[in-house]
Amino acid sequence: MFGQGRLGQAMALLLFLGMTAALARGCLQCDPNFAEKFSFYRHHVNLKSWWVGDIPVSGMLLSDWIQNTMKELHLAIPAEITRKKLYQVAEAVYQRMDQLYQGKMYFPGYFPNELRAIFREQVRLIQNAIIESRIDCQRHCGIYQYETISCSNCTDSHVICFGYYCKSSAQWESAVQGLLKYINTWHKQDEKMRTTPAFLSQNIKCLEPQHLVNLTLEKVSECLTQH
């Protein structure tokens, strides 16, 4: 397919987990059932272990769940997740937590260790959900947008990408024309107001800001097919 080489490179970039923690609160708190569920978990934590030392440790794990989630995500892309995937992750977490809370008191150390295991699994699910959506987006042909929730403030957001999965030269040409039109419109926007899509990447030299003014259809197509 046209542009598949570039798609592969983009997928590899998306799978890279950067080590700079995003300035956000988390993702799971954006689920409408989160407050009720975690309020229950916190208020019943003192009934889950025979050892009194487990109670403050478990309580801290639950209280810091959201902020610790963002510290562990380490994503090199913005933490924006689709509602469908968010609800799927939340349901998986609640299911494991509910099962844990259905048991009677546990022997010392077991309960906080199980909480840590659920936490790690939640982080992995969120990482995969965000990255998979980005990869799926790039499997389209041309400019594509999908709706998300921003994990930083739980507001509606969207992700815009450029897909390289074009099945013919005509589709590819149309995709490049759409990209050029988008770039021209983007370039005219107020720098303080606009956001920079991931595909306007420094890894693609011709799409760096200083080159956008002089872009032509031929230059864009040539540049993209070289990556």
Curated annotation (Swiss-Prot):
Per the annotation, which location comes first and is thus the protein's main one? secreted
Annotated signal peptide? 1-24
For this record, the Gene Ontology CC terms, alphabetical, are:
extracellular region
Q: Where do glycans attach?
A: 153, 214
**Xref: InterPro entries:** IZUMO (IPR029389), Izumo_fusion (IPR052868)
Subcellular localization, as worded in the UniProt entry: Secreted
What keywords would UniProt list here?
Glycoprotein, Secreted, Signal
Look up the further comments and give them.
Izumo is the name of a Japanese shrine to marriage.
Concerning its family, UniProt says: Belongs to the Izumo family.
- Tell me the PANTHER family matching this sequence: IZUMO SPERM-EGG FUSION PROTEIN 4 (PTHR37357:SF1)
Query: What is the protein's given name?
Result: Izumo sperm-egg fusion protein 4
